[in-house]
């Protein structure tokens, strides 16, 4: 039996639109949660007056259980369909969700966007403050080409499986997504009830007017991601554990290249070198790991305090690039006034987040064509596109988008909001001493 290809899935959408309920119910329907466990959770939810949250509780309980032991990242959120093995990155519902959404999205092969069809809720998600808009923008920046849209809460009394409301929601989303450059004709918009289960796995008798795929069918229609095995090895570190018997175990997703047991790897920016003793994915030992694999790998010669989230592992002959400065094409999404030289947002790139100062605004661009419309403008405001130079305040690994896109796209955050998005066009490398032992 050939092994099923692996896909990383991120679930996005506005708060309370049903992300956790959708994932919890899907896992239950696919047989990943025992009836007994569900009953137990239902009782707990009822006793706290939160009966409608029972499926969401599945995720929260799993998260708590996960946080009690060292389960190497997100093992519980794994499920299989006929065609794929899916890992759900970052179960939704985080206070810090956008930050996680950025690092999570940078590792995702596809996304499910959950959108409530309810009047008021849908509109809130699409408002300028809305996370439906923000998450779609971020998914686009982070290079997620494949999206499935779940139009949720079709069972709500004020929606009542109404085809017209579904069509209205879809038309608004299509217009917005088209503006972001998505090929909307290739995107499934599935009317679902995460709570009742309509169109998750079986076709819903409540919506005979819909003849597209169910959620699970749409998941199986996704295209497998291309594996950039020929590029230099890059593994952005998500977490670092110290595990008895194994030693220091960084966890992350292989973005490019191949990691093998016995390889010497260097972690940048710190420049520490270690030897790979073992590689593990979903509790299974591997001899090698390829792009898309979420792994833990034990390294000899590196202590837990040497490395942290945001560092990047690579091979010694082609180490990850630490930027003294970098040039980028950015698009300003939101800012209360104007962005000038000296502005210092937090740059979220792969798993790193580092404040970086704008040291030059080289040119303002036409956002649609990319043509230069003004050299050395004094300031930038919302809606502007530009070429700027950044200087990271602390050491930071970035790569040219044209060479390693996974490490070359970023979001700019400030005041708890996404201020802009960008791609790295050039890097002035910093000198780093590699501390080979």
From Swiss-Prot:
Annotated region (G5), positions in chain: 193-195
Classification via PROSITE patterns: G_TR_1 (PS00301), G_TR_2 (PS51722)
Predominant location category: cytoplasm
Pfam families: GTP-eEF1A_C, GTP_EFTU, GTP_EFTU_D2
Catalysed reaction equations from the record: GTP + H2O = GDP + phosphate + H(+)
Keywords: Cytoplasm, Elongation factor, GTP-binding, Hydrolase, Magnesium, Metal-binding, Nucleotide-binding, Protein biosynthesis
Region ranges (G2): 69-73
Positions annotated to bind GTP: 13-20, 90-94, 152-155
Location within or outside the cell: Cytoplasm
Region (G1): 13-20
Gene Ontology terms: cellular component: cytoplasm
Enzyme Commission designation: 3.6.5.3
Segments of this protein annotated with the region G3: 90-93
Leading EC class: hydrolase
Function as written in the Swiss-Prot or TrEMBL entry: GTP hydrolase that promotes the GTP-dependent binding of aminoacyl-tRNA to the A-site of ribosomes during protein biosynthesis.
Family: Belongs to the TRAFAC class translation factor GTPase superfamily. Classic translation factor GTPase family. EF-Tu/EF-1A subfamily.
Protein name: Elongation factor 1-alpha
Organism of this sequence: Aeropyrum pernix (strain ATCC 700893 / DSM 11879 / JCM 9820 / NBRC 100138 / K1)
């Amino acid at each position: 039996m050939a092994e099923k290809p692996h896909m990383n899935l991120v679930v996005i959408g506005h708060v309370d639109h049903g992300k956790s309920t959708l994932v919890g119910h899907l896992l239950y329907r696919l047989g990943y949660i025992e009836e007994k466990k569900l009953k137990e959770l239902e009782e707990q939810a009822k006793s706290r007056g939160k009966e409608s949250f029972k499926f969401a509780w599945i995720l929260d309980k799993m998260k708590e259980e996960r946080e009690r032991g060292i389960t190497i990242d997100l093992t519980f959120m794994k499920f299989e369909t006929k065609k794929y093995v899916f890992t759900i990155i970052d179960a939704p519902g985080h206070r810090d969700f956008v930050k996680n959404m950025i690092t999570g999205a940078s590792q995702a092969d596809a996304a499910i966007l959950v959108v409530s069809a309810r009047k008021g809720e849908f509109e809130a998600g699409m408002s300028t403050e809305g996370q439906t808009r923000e998450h779609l923008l971020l998914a686009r920046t982070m290079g997620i080409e494949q999206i499935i849209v779940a139009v949720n809460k079709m069972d709500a009394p004020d929606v009542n499986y109404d085809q017209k409301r579904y069509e209205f929601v879809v038309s608004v989303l299509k217009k917005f997504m088209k503006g972001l450059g998505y090929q909307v004709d290739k995107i499934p918009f599935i009317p679902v009830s995460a709570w009742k289960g309509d169109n998750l796995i079986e076709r819903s008798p409540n919506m005979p007017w819909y003849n597209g795929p169910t959620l699970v069918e749409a998941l199986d229609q996704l295209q497998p991601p291309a594996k950039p095995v020929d590029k230099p090895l890059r593994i952005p570190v998500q977490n670092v554990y110290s595990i008895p018997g194994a030693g220091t175990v960084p966890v992350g997703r292989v973005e490019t290249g191949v990691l093998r047991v016995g390889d010497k790897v260097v972690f940048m920016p710190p420049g520490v070198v270690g030897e790979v003793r073992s590689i593990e994915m979903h509790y299974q030992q591997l001899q090698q790991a390829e792009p898309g694999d979420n792994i833990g790998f034990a390294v000899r010669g590196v202590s837990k305090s040497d490395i942290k989230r945001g560092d990047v592992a690579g091979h010694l002959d082609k180490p990850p690039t630490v930027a003294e400065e970098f040039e980028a094409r950015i698009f300003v999404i939101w800012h209360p006034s104007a962005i000038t030289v000296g502005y210092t947002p937090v740059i979220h790139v792969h798993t790193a987040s580092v404040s970086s100062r704008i040291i030059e605004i080289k040119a303002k661009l036409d956002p649609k064509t990319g043509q230069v419309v003004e050299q050395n403008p004094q300031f930038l405001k919302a809606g502007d596109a530009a070429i700027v130079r950044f200087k990271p305040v602390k050491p930071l690994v970035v790569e040219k988008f044209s060479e390693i896109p996974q490490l070359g796209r970023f979001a700019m955050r400030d005041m708890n909001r996404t201020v802009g998005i960008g791609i790295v066009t050039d890097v002035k490398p910093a000198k780093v001493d590699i501390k080979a032992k």
